[in-house]
Amino acid sequence: MDPKRPTFPSPPGVIRAPWQQSTEDQSQLLDQPSLGRARGLIMPIDEPLPGRGRAFSVPGEMPVRFGRGITQSIAAEPLVGMARGVRLPMEEGGFGRGRGFLLPTPEPTVGIGRGAAIGPVPTLDIQKAEVEEKMPELQAEVAPTVAKVGSPGTGSSLVSMFRGLGIEPGKTWGRGAAPVGRGAAGDMGADLQPKPTIIGASLTPEREEVRSEESISFLGRGFTGFGRAAMPHMTVGRGPIGPLSPSPSVAAPFSLISASSASEDAPVAPGTPPKVEVKIETVKEPLQKIGTKGSPIPIGSNYIPICCKNDAVFQYHVTFTPNVESLSMRFGMMKEHRPTTGEVVAFDGSILYLPKRLEEVVHLKAERKTDNQEIDIKIQLTKILPPSSDLCIPFYNVVLRRVMKILGLKLVGRNHYDPNAVVILGKHRLQVWPGYSTSIKHTDGGLYLVVDVSHKVLRNDSVLDVMNLIYQGSRESFQDECTKEFVGSIVITRYNNRTYRIDDIEWSKSPKDTFTLADGSVTTFVDYYRKNYGITIKELDQPLLIHRPKERSRPGGKVITGEILLLPELSFMTGIPEKMRKDFRAMKDLTMHINVGAQQHTQSLKQLLHNINSNNEALSELGRWGLSISQEILVTQGRTLPSETICLHSASFVTSPAVDWSRELVRDPSISTVPLNCWAVFYPRRATDQAEELVTTFSRVAGPMGMRVERPIRVELRDDRTETFVKSIHSQLTSEPRVQLVVCIMTGNRDDLYSAIKKLCCIQSPVPSQAINVRTISQPQKLRSVAQKILLQINCKLGGELWTVNVPLKYLMVIGVDVHHDTSKKSRSVMGFVASLNSMLTKWYSRVTFQMPNEEIINGFRVCLLAALQKYYEVNHAFPEKIVIYRDGVSDGQLKTVEHYEIPQILKCFETIPNYEPKLAFIVVQKRISTTLYSYGSDHFGTPSPGTVLDHTVTNRDWVDFYLMAHSIRQGCGLPTHYITVYNTANLTPDHLQRLTFKMCHLYWNWPGTIRVPAPCKYAHKLAFLSGQYLHSEPAIQLSEKLFFL
């Protein structure tokens, strides 16, 4: 009972109905009719029974507490409360509302819907003996469809529902248990009511006084037991129910006790085994996420259907008495009882999963080896899971890893590779290991094996070999150069195929040093590798590499901390060398083996499936859990979204199938351009010719694009040192404050010079800047095309607008958010925030915030959002009505955090603006996913066209999500982007969300085509990358309305 709710005592001389007392006193009388919530069929009954109506009558001026009717004095005969305020006198008996059907009864009986009113219905005159005679037949008909569930024990959640109501769990309360409707109402007369017997309840004098008063009132949605819940004396529903009105000689089915004693055990017959609560996991209803716009097409994916032959997986809780702390001891004790549990188990120390059902409670005995203590092991059934339950997925993946090992694949990191199929690139001293990344997922379409082709690039050179090369090149700064080269990189030790990240180099130690083993013995590194791996260490004076693993627990309770020391001679570099990334020919040779097309990709998948299904040992391992993997790749129906129209200043056109409009962009004027009247070019003396040629080309190509470019201020530098550039730029900006743009022509890829220029132009003296590598403008045949692209980028940085698409939503703000890690302080991260300022989505506002690991990202997000809203109001003289946020950098495990923490904080931001409640859609953008899509036709797999969307079968069961491939693929497979709608009050349907997202992928002005993510996300990424990689500080606020970071 709500303590804040006022009490209304009954008028003197009026007796309150016993079922009304149960509401006020939080207890129920023993011999009164039981109240249930059956939605079953209507059966004949022997006397009027109470239901629940939404209207009722009360005597005199007594305050109305229940229902929605009006107050009226009551005559001798009762009135029935009809639906929502309709009152009707009845001569005898009554009826309630029936939403279903009424079975034929000895006399016609009427069921009525909401709001209907009917005249009196005669009370059915059926003797109890007649009902009792019919009971066995009715039970026999119902029994086959009723599942038997034991009555709950003390700790049952079913019992807790009634705790505090004074009801002892002597019988199961099922949904359809009680033969009375949804509640009690009316007054049957004092002479008809059974005398209450209170067991274990203590009533205060005030309560006793209230009970002695007289009252007539109605509670519930009906009057008699006709309608939703009336039933005869029968056991229907999810548990056994005793008779409705037990005779005084029969024990009552329920004992009424006080709230303080509600948790006592129910009396059970001698010899009855204890009952435990077993939960059955329910199947979730699918979410409405499927769109209809676009052309249907067949789509293939790297999802392989998995069939579960078992009916269920059974979850047990294992208790050790006395307690056993060591996990390894627990595993050993459970292994001794495999004859009971079976050979197929999944056990984590306390939760046990089996594919077979044991008794509800099983007691086993074991002996602790350390002190010979006898341990009692209690295995109690707690939950019955469908075989596709999310709780089963982790140990299904363990089974899958065993299968991959059976096939001869080696686990490196999280993926499996085939060392027997290695590809040697001798010219580049590289090895490519082909392999697979695999996982089992439960999606909207069921249980699937997700397989992706993976490649591991290993170098033939060990870390020691690279150290020798560095020593030959720079002996003076040898250790510093080694630290720059190795710290942060990933190495593999081939004696165990494990990968490690190098965190530091220990120069003071060598393989001749000793270390302590797990058993306490001391040995040298040389002896350790000779005894355990048969490896002879050749270089005895090499330093050691340090790997600091993240603190984590291993099975057995052992916590891994400290450092792992590795030998450079046995550690091999992984990944593509930085020098090789800049070598076009070397990268072309490598990508031939890494970037496989759709047909080759699917062939690799089919080969793996064939290997699994043709290996008896692998099939046996899967069959232990009732799993079987199909040999066919999933093919389902997707859609291709309609093409978009690109709008320039005075021209518009529909995109081509390749979604590339670079020709139209340089042929027609942009939406708006900024005249380049005062700008400066800085270049070293040896790049004078290239600088002059570039300025001339700017003048030739600017006209057709709608730009006006004046002659720049030329500043020739005597050298290309960083100090020379910075001093010259600072001097020029000081002497000529009207400079709109700084262009720097640099020789080579120099991060230090680039960072210094950007810090000066983005923080100290805010002005848009353009850095150009001299190699980019050194080829005359490509100079015109390069100049056009640079001019378009410059126009964006100055505040110009290039193109847009038609977005029908007015007063819309689209926001992009991405997070990047600051390279100067590895623990610090930077968030880029970009928001649109106009309905055409061509004006953007950008901000940056830095935060430490223990600081929530939402703190800086709130500041950026309020600033963007204020700027939007300054531009439009109104706040946006709808806000769509695209949030990048969120993994599946962080979705609930975003939903329960970030979004409420965003909503609180809106409360700071009076009378402002915008509609919000929050969409998470995921690029690093394992899903691959293929076009399919004539038994041939290809690359999907841009605009391909898939919003069912492979989607997440818990969210409204879809996969969209917005960009054009020239080589490799179709890698879509996953969009998850975490929050949506903007009334945007799945079609709206998909089409808006596709439109936003057209608006990245650095590329005249579609990109993989929405443009605001890409802008936010570029801004966060610039700030975290080079600036290490927030850019000046003067640049916030320009895309200076492109």
Curated annotation (Swiss-Prot):
Location of the Piwi domain: 741-1032
Annotated compartments: Cytoplasm; Nucleus
EC class: hydrolase
A UniProt-annotated Pfam family: PAZ
Biased composition (Polar residues): 19-31
Enzyme Commission designation: 3.1.26.-
Disruption phenotype: Progressive loss of germ cells due to apoptosis from 6 weeks of age.
Names of required cofactors: Mg(2+)
A GO biological-process term: spermatogenesis
Function according to Swiss-Prot or TrEMBL: Endoribonuclease that plays a central role during spermatogenesis by repressing transposable elements and preventing their mobilization, which is essential for the germline integrity. Plays an essential role in germ cell differentiation and meiosis, independently of the function in transposable elements repression. Acts via the piRNA metabolic process, which mediates the repression of transposable elements during meiosis by forming complexes composed of piRNAs and Piwi proteins and govern the methylation and subsequent repression of transposons.
Name of this chain's protein: Piwi-like protein 2
Organism: Danio rerio
Species classification: Eukaryota, Metazoa, Chordata, Craniata, Vertebrata
Gene designation per UniProt: piwil2
